[in-house]
């Protein structure tokens, strides 16, 4: 019904739907981290032909939406026998023929008819390569006539041809070429409409799917229809309908997707390992010869897409006399990706992050990742991962860093230190329920400090090159609905590390250790205003803690300069603090418009070398006010802060994802 169509259009996540991205909630925690680190990801595909005949977007999310909406019609069917007869148009770019779908798989026909060249990848069907039929027939009233329509009310949402002054960029030129290609047929077909309704779509395109654009276009459509009201009333009389006649509405239609459960006779998979089949069947509680909720099917789809192992995931649900047959079609990833991150801030000016990730065609899924960071501090990391089971990985990594860091004391720069850092890590990670990840392993670290440049009167340190072996265990739980500026969710992290210099002792004595934990929650009181409380801290356990592991506090983010760094609003720079630190914080965040945010932050830090005396020392308080813009290239932020430790106003600017 019209109401259902309106509801369907307004409730879609169009930016996600018109991309190949996986929604934040359905991504693995690794994918979430990558999506909030890199501004550009370029696939270096193994199959070159896919690049030649491809588009920017594969249309995986659209294809799954079409499959969802057409559940119960996944067989090859006659479209004329649908409750409302249907046809759609594509063009076969092999020979330029117009292809009119009157039968076949409904979802495939819909996907082929909207494959805009250069935007969405074409649909391969037998020996045909099909794209959007707009270049051949973008107002197909002739097809409606051929199907038996005596009366046609034609609604035209195509842009008029542009003038020379309006052709100023590649997109406008490309759209003009498409419109010119089918212009003759278009003008002929307008004459076949009994009532022709021309909607003013100036200023909008086929990609205008944000809420303001949708509302404007719907209103313009209504205005265009009312302009033809006299013609519509005249048509009503001509076909013999009384003035008080109201046409019976079709529907309301209900999708099988909305039903509670279905009986599934058989579940089959194409392109999946037997171990993965058993895992997904168990994970999503899928059983043959049993009733299944449609939510289980959706969970299986999102789990497979978010597993990082498959590039495309689709399904067919076919009705048989014995029950439904559920068939999953998967394309395994054997691809390489080049990822790029870039950011600017008021301290390090510019930083660049490059990453290449390549999967191997091995019996046990595996991949290698090579990362490099350029800037004031630089880094190189090589990581090899084995995944014997879905969501369970063994990681082997080596990392080198050169760091150049300023350390402050009560707001004044105390000294600058430069050092080289080497680490080798063996770890195991396991993801439970998509939002919870556990990790454990062994780490080797070597610190070689080169220079300490002190301000006049600063305390001198003697830090010699030193190596450490550490055991670690960590847990991370995250239910945010997005990485930056989330409107709901919780983040909980915890890590315990035990440090030695020979795997059992440190300098002939018991090892020392560190325990760090954090909690933060986002509670939206309205759709624009949110409270974000948090509690976090780090405790060092043992005597004579080496310099590289001393607690550090300051800045906007966890672990930005040092892994143990704790953020604190009002302390702009990095300061070395006591062995036990506990911080409580509250943020008040107001969204202005759709992407602008103003945030007020207040926090208090309790600290002492002895954890049991942490309440005895005078606490440090601080606060800040900041502005942020949620851009396509990451957060653009600026803040002013003040604290009782520095006793001065600090200013900080960050442009881009933090890494």
Enumerate the predicted regions with their spans.
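Buried hydrophobic packing residues in well-ordered domains
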Residues: 5, 96, 132, 144, ...
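Flexible glycine-/small-residue-rich
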Residues: 90-93, 102, 199-201, 271-273, ...
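A generic beta-sheet turn/junction motif
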Residues: 92-94, 273, 319-321, 629-633, ...
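Gram-negative/organellar outer-membrane beta-barrel architecture
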Residues: 295, 300, 306, 312-484, ...
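Short glycine-rich beta-strand segments
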Residues: 401-405, 443-447, 493-503, 538-540, ...
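C-terminal hydrophobic structural anchor segments
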Residues: 589-620
